[in-house]
Amino acid sequence: MFDSLDLVIDTIVAREVLDSRGNPTVEAEVLLEGGASGRAIVPSGASTGAHEAHELRDGGDRYMGKGVIQAVNHIEERIAPALCGLSALDQAAVDAAMLELDGSDNKSSLGANAILAVSMANARAAANGLGLPLYRYLGGPMATLLPVPLMNVINGGAHAANSLDFQEFMLVPHGAPSFREALRMGTEVFHTLKKLLSAKGMSTAVGDEGGFAPDLGNVEAGEILVEAIEKAGYKPGEQISLALDVASTEFFADGRYAFDGGSYDSAEMVGQLEKLVEQFPIVSIEDGLAEDDWEGWKLLTERLGSKVQLVGDDLFVTNTKRLQQGIDSSTANSILIKVNQIGSLTETLQAIDLAGRSGYTSVISHRSGETEDTTIADLSVATRAGQIKTGSLSRSERVAKYNQLLRIEDELGSQAVYAGAVGQGPRGNA
């Protein structure tokens, strides 16, 4: 038996560390009375939605203005005194105390990066205090579903210095019998793709998320991915499909979308996406239209919502208010879940719950500025989300999440269920 006093928060410390892009980020450690502790590091995005929670940066010359000493100080000087003495088991109370202390709508007082670091570290400390893995602590005995990975193997847009407008072209190995086999399938296609790009004289340098960043058009990227799937010995659309992150807010201005040398209004943009769905085995499209183009999104949902998964990232920013607006207007059918968009674990879980109750899927996601923290791997299993998006098959901050999912699958043994094997995850009309 555990002593409840052992699970009381005793000390909280924080430090400035680096993310995968060499930018500062916040790490927090929560230590409990009984000696257990938890550590977490927050990620950071490149293409950020205008409605995301506020990430506090120092400004000035240090680290080119990207330092996070203010956020670190807020943890140690303001958050720690407010939380010490609370039970780490009451995650909702811990997060509520920080939100009350912050007092703003977008966490701009303390910084979402300060609040989230403590929120995630607290959950891990509580799990460690109970002797439970994080996925089991958060998800209970039903946390046995391993997610279908959406593997970003070709990077463009804000994630790479190339000519590709769309931000991510992903492999979706939904036809695998297990997560381990899905990872193998994706990895084999990744290496096959590298050989194809090299043979065509294209760059095999990788972008922020570990995918290749060749100079291609959007159609060419789809064509070479299908070729790589086939050459690796798999059937496009049956075993491995494609997913896109258009990140269209990045090339939207004055009511028009400018990409691949053309300029399109919302209806024309929807038409362009329809053509791609007809041409390729695409099962999921993220941010197909800009974050505040609600009318365009409604049209996209009417035209493609019954055929493919339409994921709102910048549209919803893991925010229940914006998600409810989408639900009420039948806009999109899926939400991308990024813990640092909303800034606390409790609010993240609330967004996933609202999505599930409303018939929307959830895709647990990393950010382009990642770290070795593997919380989102456990979160994907804990919430039975059935999908995870955590980059390519290179760069250790991406692979860390895949390796954690392998460990979880092994630990679950015969209880483990791969979402793709039971018809969950994106399947589209492939």
From Swiss-Prot:
It is found in: Cytoplasm; Secreted; Cell surface. InterPro entries: Enolase, Enolase-like_C_sf, Enolase-like_N, Enolase_C, Enolase_CS, Enolase_N. The active site is at E209 (proton donor), K338 (proton acceptor). The keyword Secreted applies. Pathway: Carbohydrate degradation; glycolysis; pyruvate from D-glyceraldehyde 3-phosphate: step 4/5. One of its GO terms (molecular function) is phosphopyruvate hydratase activity. It comes from the Bacteria. Belongs to the enolase family. NCBIfam families: eno. This is Enolase. It comes from Synechococcus sp. (strain WH7803).
